[in-house]
From Swiss-Prot:
A single GO BP: photosynthesis, light reaction
Subcellular location: Plastid, Chloroplast thylakoid membrane
Highest classification ranks of the organism: Eukaryota, Viridiplantae, Streptophyta, Embryophyta, Tracheophyta
Ligand binding ([4Fe-4S] cluster): C43, C44, C108, C139
Zinc keyword on record: no
Originating species: Atropa belladonna (Belladonna)
Sample GO molecular function, one term: NADH dehydrogenase (ubiquinone) activity
Name listed for the protein in its UniProt record: NAD(P)H-quinone oxidoreductase subunit K, chloroplastic
Main enzyme class: translocase
Length: 225
């Protein structure tokens, strides 16, 4: 063994030693290389598509869009989720490897939006199907808001503990076979209620048939008086 000393090498190696934990190293590597699966169904996805341009340049965050859920660790749902699309969304989430994250973008994804009141086929919130990490409200959210949501997700990943993530996986498991959607008959048929539509305010207590029958039997001068 050659006993030649390398003082410069020893000094350089001593000054460049980094001590960390395996958990912090894993978090640092994941937060800088998020690979999103873009699940866009409505106008909110158009706002996210503007991030690809040079004005916002989302490549600087390490985002690499993937077309396969098996290669993604982040799914971004943007737009309305219907009952027929719900099993497909859950299956995509199940096919993603652990650890995986979800960003719910837009009012339609979070609460159902304007379709949540009288729509029979809209899911009232994607968190009823899969666990959501970051909620991004808006109709639609601006690209700056999307960047802020990604930044908050990166901060969450940096503070994450491996034990907590394993514990949450046992609680927030979503299986496709457990989601049984029953489509019930809606009371909103789309037909106008003729009694409400043609009923004057002054004759609200008079049935429609009696009112029009009396109106046709009375002459014009009597109506004027």
């Amino acid at each position: 063994m050659n006993s030649i000393q390398f003082p410069l090498l020893d000094r350089t190696a001593q000054n460049s030693v980094i001590s960390t934990t395996l958990n912090d190293l894993s978090n640092w590597s994941r937060l800088s290389s998020l690979w999103p699966l873009l699940y866009g169904t409505s106008c909110c996805f158009i706002e996210f598509a503007s991030l690809i341009g040079s004005r916002f340049d989302f490549d600087r965050y390490g985002l690499v869009p993937r077309s396969s859920p098996r290669q993604a660790d982040l799914i971004l749902t943007a737009g309305t989720v219907t009952m027929k699309m719900a099993p497909s969304l859950v299956r995509l989430y199940e096919q993603m490897p652990e650890p995986k994250y979800v960003i719910a973008m837009g009012a339609c994804t979070i609460t159902g939006g304007m379709f949540s009141t009288d729509s029979y086929s809209t899911v009232r919130g994607v968190d009823k199907l899969i666990p959501v990490d970051v909620y991004l409200p808006g109709c639609p959210p601006k690209p700056e808001a999307v960047i802020d949501a990604i930044t908050k997700l990166r901060k969450k990943i940096s503070r994450e503990l491996y034990e907590d993530r394993i514990r949450s996986q046992r609680v927030n498991r979503c299986f496709t076979t457990n989601h049984k959607f029953h489509v019930r008959r809606s009371i909103h048929t789309g037909n106008y209620d003729q009694r409400v539509l043609y009923q004057p305010p002054s004759t609200s207590e008079i049935p429609t048939e009696i009112f029009f029958k009396y109106k046709n039997s009375v002459s014009s001068p009597e109506l004027v008086n």
